[in-house]
Amino acid sequence: MMPVVQDRKAQICALLKSIETGEPEPIAVFNQQQYIQHNPHTQEGSEGLEELFKRLSQTSPRVNIVRAFEDGDYVFAHTEYDFVRSNIGFGVFRFENDHVVEHWDNIQPRQDPNISGLTLVEGPSEATDHNLTETNRQTVSAFVETVLVRRQFAQLEDHFEGSELIQHNPQLSNGVKAFRAALEERNGAGFTIEYPRLHRVLAEGNFVLSVSEGSRNDVHSSFYDLFRLSKGKLAEHWGTIEDIPPHSAWKNDNGKF
């Protein structure tokens, strides 16, 4: 008999939805003996995942998985969470064989639409151009390393098709000009950002997620940036920024990244 091939994206979507429903079955995708949690606000071993999800479901949450992608042993999802307050988050799950053994995330509060009328989540959700996955990964890696990390802004426009960029950052408007002004700290948006380190780049087709460490207004922060590419150029951008608490406040010792 041939082994059953599990749809990892479907498993993760069911898992995330079980936060809302309290259903215990999707939690079986975790290997709870090997599971490594990188959310510094979550304590390992304090309660089983089944009990945790059941408790969360009693708060009447709503969970909407906007888009999900798969890259080798990784699944990454872009999700709306409504608990006590409304949040937007990226979750990254690493599989070993049939089970999740590691998890990272980056969450920020939902905000009003930006000046271009766009929210943190709307837009295309299905990956295309799967034959270009590695090319697109390299394109985003080069952009992050060159423009965001090394701050070589003269090369920024090389990564876009003319002046076009669909921008979902709540502080920015559409267009490459507004993006460059924000990076150069001359846009009047009231924030400064630095990206000294790129940790991970995940990709499926024309969607690429970069995971970076840096600071916002001199506060240690994590940056998850999702790009949609078209014809080899960056065409659309979503992201979340989350403050990283001081090590003394961490509830596990696994690190944010």
Please report, for each region that a protein language model flagged, where it lies by residue.
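C-terminal and inter-domain tail/linker signature
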Residues: 1-257
